[in-house]
Curated annotation (Swiss-Prot):
Presence of the UniProt keyword ATP-binding in the record: yes
Superkingdom field: Eukaryota
Organism annotation: Leishmania donovani
Gene designation: HSP70
Chain spans, region Disordered: 616-653
Protein name from the UniProt record: Heat shock 70 kDa protein
Amino acid sequence: MTFDGAIGIDLGTTYSCVGVWQNERVDIIANDQGNRTTPSYVAFTDSERLIGDAAKNQVAMNPHNTVFDAKRLIGRKFNDSVVQSDMKHWPFKVTTKGDDKPMIAVQYRGEEKTFTPEEISSMVLLKMKETAEAYLGKQVKKAVVTVPAYFNDSQRQATKDAGTIAGLEVLRIINEPTRAIAYGLDKGDDGKERNVLIFDLGGGTFDVSLLTIDGGIFEVKATNGDTHLGGEDFDNRLVTFFTEEFKRKNKGKNLASSHRALRGLRTACERAKRTLSSATQATIEIDALFENVDFQATITRARFEELCGDLFRSTIQPVERVLQDAKMDKRSVHDVVLVGGSTRIPKVQSLVSDFFGGKELNKSINPDEAVAYGAAVQAFILTGGKSKQTEGLLLLDVTPLTLGIETAGGVMTALIKRNTTIPTKKSQIFSTYADNQPGVHIQVFEGERAMTKDCHLLGTFDLSGIPPAPRGVPQIEVTFDLDANGILNVSAEEKGTGKRNQITITNDKGRLSKDEIERMVNDAMKYEADDRAQRDRVEAKNGLENYAYSMKNTLGDSNVSGKLDDSDKATLNKEIDVTLEWLSSNQEATKEEYEHKQKELESVCNPIMTKMYQSMGGAGGGMPGGMPDMSGMSGGAGPAGGASSGPKVEEVD
């Protein structure tokens, strides 16, 4: 059965979250581990692929093949200075095939595989989709996915592609300030217009948005931020600090050469950082961190604030910029709402509060779940959902960066200015630069600088077939059409001849082609099938193990063993021991082999147990002494110590 609504997914740098609107409210859905946020981690091993908590839990043992931070790579080029700088901190390998697209290389099932950041993100999205499906009991096809407000066009497109690869129809890519909906619905409507500043500092990105909330209308006035600032950067500072501390305490031993040691240290640093939000000092203790040397060190909150001081202070500039862009004085801001796990850091809170003259900050919404909450509300509205609470609700979003084309001399001529409400459409007339020019080469840029060389090239196209004419005579109308996803279509028309050409900005260099997306969708299905096969294999193995051990326990029960012939008892014990021995030396056997082995064991056990049972004059019902009911024990065999329809307990490796 398919769910007729849509889910809201917050695809985060470090953690992701999923929500759905049901019964007049948003439910944030817990994953299979009972956690309401899921680590954005994917791990590859010799036998399986792990996503979420399972991936993060084994990272110290498998650092080279555990991928995280895909959001810091998505929509970027390999040679981007940001990517090059991040690569120094990542234990996994990032390469390129010469086209400047970053590729992540891992060992999976004994061979090297490469994945695009979109594919890794799609695996996290798939996990969120499965989490929602387990909760709803229905198949989910549609979703709204959030991105930082300051994401550029190629990063948005790449995120949308990731959704497609995960088998989702992405109804809308929305900016994370949509979390304001969570705040707005929480506050209720008091009939007054309120200016609200959303300050969102997460695991890897930072956004500031200024909104006016009036009734159900949420109008984004301005947005700013840094797509590369968050909790991970604070962790990096701590890792560097403790690496030096370790070197100082241990005669120059440099643990930076060991990815495993670094990973263990990073996990401890993340924990220490969280501790420092509520305590004034934190201690890290790691046994055998590097070259069998134990490490213990303490850090105070004051030292942490000094280490990250410049990063904390850098969050204020975007706040100043949004106020400037919205032409608003900071005294006119009614509420400052904190979102994102990193806003729990006391120094960040005091900096923001001081900037607003000691204003009390609003912490009423859960910083980890607010984005998914807003996305779930949007998903409900976009699939035609009707509710008293969402009636009249309208989110007017804006484009974060100026969009324009290059004109003579490399000048950036803006058509859509930053912080313009979207969707929007703007046209402007241009002409030729030389006499008898047969065509024009239109280059589309994104950015705030006066010259295009300092802006980001989105795409190019040609308009040819212009009739010969003196320069400045032909009239070429260029139209920019920016949709609600923040994705751009550009067209150009020569007014005299009606010749027309257009481009959907797909940033060909950084963007996946249709064929690549199709290939990745098929790969994703294959990996999903592999995961399913692995689950079935483990279930068959557990089924055999449970059956063998429950038989062994039954034979150990005096009520049963006393009623069996010695020869039958010896036969059963021998057969069970042979099976258990086979199991211990065939941990990687196929599902069919486990099932076959179980049938073999059943063919010996069932007749003997049935004979004993009949000699006792019993018929129907379960066996005495905790003996499982054999009638349910066919083929893929059930759980131990009960009928095969009972609950299954997974073995934890």
